[in-house]
Amino acid sequence: GSEMCIRDSSIVSQLYHDGYMEARSVEQTKVFEAAEQFARIEGILPAPESSHAIRVAIDEAVKCRETGEAKTIVFGLTGTGYFDMVAYEKFYNGEMRDFIPTDAQLAESFASLPQVPGLDN
């Protein structure tokens, strides 16, 4: 994947905290499958970061089709994937692997984060 530094917006974090949005975990290969589908239909190679949102939007649309629910689905396309061709190459060559950390690995990682005064840690 990408070696980019990804930061959370304080506004997005607050919207999540207040229950206006949810976070979802998506396997890397499923993300790139969605990116490929989007590129074939729209003619735009999406950035991997945007492709996570595309995957979830597709999943939501399929769920709505199956349940008959009418819903407006919006996602952000924040960039193209032309700077991340190595990741696309790994996907197409079958070299990309999904990594799903265990609860113990997550707990160990979270325990190593610095404590920030004034935040719920």
Q: Which residues does each predicted region cover?
A:
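Active-site-adjacent helical/loop segments in soluble small-molecule enzymes
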Residues: 9-66
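Short, small-residue-biased leader/transition segments that mark boundaries at the very start
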Residues: 1-6
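Short, acidic Gly/Pro/Ser/Thr-rich loop/turn segments
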Residues: 7-10, 81-83
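Catalytic phosphate/nucleotide-handling subdomain of diverse soluble enzymes
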Residues: 58-117
